[in-house]
Curated annotation (Swiss-Prot):
Residues 402-488 form the Disintegrin domain. Residues 1-20 form the signal peptide. This is Zinc metalloproteinase-disintegrin-like BITM06A. It comes from Bothrops insularis. Binds 1 zinc ion per subunit. The lineage of its organism: Eukaryota, Metazoa, Chordata, Craniata, Vertebrata. Monomer. GO terms for biological process: proteolysis. The active site is at 335. Its EC number is 3.4.24.-. Residues 198-394 form the Peptidase M12B domain. Residues 21-189 form a propeptide.
Length: 610
């Protein structure tokens, strides 16, 4: 039985209008002072654990009472979590600290469906919560013999530099397909049954400049990294992702690479070190370097796109440019989003009334929301590229997170989970037991209507292309059947292409996606450039070397398009970027001749390819 702690925060709530105070988060010029008083609900004589699994905090914000519900983030650390630093003489020191009884929580505000919270309860309460669509921060004031805390808004923190900050990735994403509904981009029923989430094992590296910035206080650095990881973990849940911290390395006796303001150089150097050094010592899926170096220009983060699970490129670099944890954690999640195949948002992407996390310019208001575009691109990457490293289930030495009834996550042993009894809005689910109510066949799923299985034949997943037929309910389950595609190699689009993994890839669509309307497949003569084997014209890469196309394979290298748009007359237009050399290549499965498709940079017979 989880013991519940009730803490009443008595407010001597007086905003200091016009006055300021220096906190860990910076110079704050408008805040409320609160004095937490812990009132335990444990039975008399019971032993109180150091950090409870679940807690409630009652307090007031702007004179209004609120109740903050918190649950320990038991998936924050992997069971084999390790920490490495270096002695003054350069010796590597690795430890495996006990992290089960940690003090990092996620939560929500009672009766506020849009609320979220990420709190450290290690030494007082530190973190942030969202209440009535506004983000508030709470932090101990650290006055002698006082339990005083400050509550304040981000807008009241003085900024050292008001100049706009940006991600260094310069690519934009365009789509020739209509926006897909989130319900159509789901993991198969079999995958959902055993593993509804994807699990990213995150490794954080802290450079020497960060150590200097923190006066060599390794404990302070560790606490900050835990807080950042706790927030990143919370943010990624919007994508049905779970980031567990598997390791932390602090370059306390000098950097292992040369960290420069040049983000291209630093990202590539870190990626190479990760591949040749870190991966040989510690299994992980993704690594991020946090540095106090000031990157060139307004850039504060940089990453490879669509590289999750790659032995070298599943990395990102982030500048620790703000003392506010939420701000830096948002950048970390943004860059990991790039690794997960997400590009920057464009004008047609939406997060409702909130700024989006994947905007190219960092918003003045920290946002934890991914747009509809981000969701689509992430799961499109996962379903098409199938990165294997994030499929491992949270068992054994992986994430330790037992089911918790009432957290609105469907976990092992639960038939449904609609939140707490006071917040549950699912008429099929008993919130107290996380079991279906009597007479209910289901409580969720694309084939569940009014607590009953949908009739057999009801469409539950629309056709997304000629090669992807619609799926229909069976009448025996609440889940939509697994997404089934037509056989690879089946002709499609009036024989202009062949089916490949549910799509019908043709060069016209790929040109449209890269350059927009009035752009078409170029003449055959343009593709001869792919025989050069130079930085852009090649068919494939082997051990880092670009292999020129054989004459019969030229249509399976770089894509060339004819641009007839107003003001343009480019018969051999192509796309190339140092950030993502693969973008602009002809996609696998594309028709390259009658009866032939592209496969690994070769134009081969359909029967051979499939």
């Amino acid at each position: 039985m989880i013991q519940v702690l009730l803490v009443t925060i008595c407010l001597a709530a007086f905003p200091y209008q016009g006055s300021s105070i220096i906190l860990e988060s910076g110079n704050v010029n408008d805040y409320e002072v609160v004095y937490p008083r812990k009132v335990t609900a444990l039975p008399k004589g019971a032993v109180q654990p150091k950090y409870e699994d679940a807690m409630q905090y009652e307090f007031k914000v702007n004179g209004e009472p609120v109740v903050l519900h918190l649950e320990k983030n038991k998936g924050l650390f992997s069971k084999d979590y390790s920490e490495t630093h270096y002695s003054p003489d350069g010796r590597e020191i690795t430890t495996y600290p006990a992290v089960e009884d940690h003090c990092y929580y996620h939560g929500r505000i009672e009766n506020d469906a849009d609320s979220t919270a990420s709190i450290s309860a290690c030494n007082g309460l530190k973190g942030h919560f969202k209440l009535q669509r506004e983000t508030y921060f709470i932090e101990p004031l650290k006055l002698s013999n006082s339990e005083a805390h400050a509550v304040f808004k981000y807008e009241n923190v003085e900024k050292e530099d008001e100049a706009p900050k940006m991600c260094g990735v310069t690519q934009n994403w365009k789509s020739y397909e209509p926006i897909k509904k989130a319900s159509q981009l789901v993991v198969t029923a079999e995958q959902q049954k055993y593993n509804p989430f994807r699990y990213v094992e995150l490794f954080i590296v802290v450079d020497q400049e960060m150590v200097t910035k923190n006066n060599g206080d390794l404990d302070k650095i560790k606490a900050r990294m835990y807080e950042l990881a706790n927030i990143v973990n919370e943010i990624l849940r919007y994508l049905y992702m779970h980031a567990a911290l598997v390791g932390l390395e602090i370059w306390s006796n000098g950097d292992k690479i040369t960290v420069k303001p040049d983000v291209d150089y630093t990202l590539n150097s870190f990626a190479e070190w990760r591949k040749t050094d870190l991966l040989t010592r510690k299994k992980h899926d993704n690594a991020q370097l946090l540095t106090a170096i000031d990157f060139n220009g307004p850039t504060i983060g940089y990453a490879y796109i669509g590289s999750m699970c790659h032995p070298k490129r599943s990395v990102a670099i982030v500048e620790d440019y703000s003392p506010i944890n939420l701000v830096v954690a948002v950048i970390m999640a943004h860059e990991m989003g790039h690794n997960l195949g997400i590009h920057h948002d464009t004008d047609f992407c939406s997060c409702g009334d909130y700024p989006c996390i994947m905007g190219p310019t960092i918003s003045n208001e920290p946002s934890k929301f991914f747009s509809n575009c981000s969701y689509i691109q992430c799961w499109d990457f996962i379903m098409k590229e199938n990165p294997q490293c994030i499929l491992n289930e949270p068992l054994g030495t992986d994430i330790v997170s037992p089911p918790v009834c009432g957290n609105e996550l469907l976990e092992v042993g639960e038939e449904c989970d609609c939140g707490t009894p006071e917040n549950c809005q699912n008429e099929c689910c008993d919130a107290a037991t996380c079991k279906l109510k009597s007479g209910s066949q289901c409580g969720h799923g694309d084939c569940c209507e009014q607590c009953k299985f949908s009739k057999s034949g009801t469409e539950c997943r629309a056709s997304m292309s000629e090669c992807d037929p619609a799926e229909h309910c069976t009448g025996q389950s609440s889940e939509c059947p697994a997404d089934v595609f037509h056989k690879n190699g089946q002709p499609c689009l009036d024989n202009y292409g062949y089916c490949y993994n549910g799509n019908c890839p043709i060069m016209y669509h790929q040109c449209y996606a890269l350059f927009g309307a009035d752009v078409y497949e170029a003449e055959d003569s343009c593709f001869k450039d792919n025989q050069k084997g130079n930085y852009y014209g090649y068919c494939r890469k082997e051990n880092g070397k670009k292999i020129p196309c054989a004459p019969e394979d030229v249509k399976c290298g770089r894509l060339y398009c004819k641009d007839n748009s107003p003001g343009q007359n480019n018969p051999c237009k192509m796309f190339y970027s140092n950030d993502d050399e693969h973008k602009g290549m002809v996609l696998p499965g594309t028709k390259c001749a009658d009866g032939k498709v592209c496969s690994n940079g070769h134009c081969v017979d359909v029967a051979t390819a499939y």
